[in-house]
């Protein structure tokens, strides 16, 4: 069953002059279609200006299509009467956790969403504890978010969304402001949410190595979907990805160069271990 379905979605920003008159329009998304099944881990890859973040904001009705339709669990994103339910169904996590965390204490911040939903107090306590345990943040429940690392803050942001019991979490470049350790921390948490909790994950990123465990990758450029497929299918197209200003993981690039020089290894290598195993077979 589809949890997210986009049909020929186009979005245009209106440009106005200093008097407020319309000067023209910029097309940020151009006829994008996408079908995300419940329980999938999907990654949307693209360089800055590709339209990926603009598209992400359509997935819980922050933005509405100029043309086309976005369905969230069968609900039209343009249906004002369903807006509350849509945002419960598809939670959103943004790039900077400091802009999303509002509580003075971690557990208070995680409780904010369920409180606004009108959840009974005893259930809020259960949801907060459950979300913090799932994200490995229970020991920080009484701490100030200001004392946490970037990766820990982002996990608190994700816990706040998780406490609202969404079917899907959309994450718009959640690791962009983190160091490598923080990035790994967040991606590990997302994989666990998907594999253990069966929550649909839609990850928006320009870091290709974060997408290796996805069920499917969509590559965007200039507002359009240029490629889609499994990580192995996508990573095979090294030159094309570089044209879209995406940085192919070093191990995949190394394997690609070896292959070009005639080394008999598989077409697409995704990890150090895969490359080591392939080279061992040649000895």
Model-derived features: where do they sit?
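Conserved ABC ATPase "signature" region
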Residues: 122-140
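The feature captures the beta-strand-to-loop junction immediately N-terminal to the Walker
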Residues: 45-47
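Conserved ABC transporter NBD signature motif
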Residues: 68-78, 86
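Conserved ABC ATPase signature
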Residues: 144-148, 152
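Catalytic Walker B motif of ABC-type/P-loop ATPase nucleotide-binding domains
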Residues: 169-172
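Helix-to-loop junction immediately C-terminal to a conserved catalytic motif
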Residues: 60
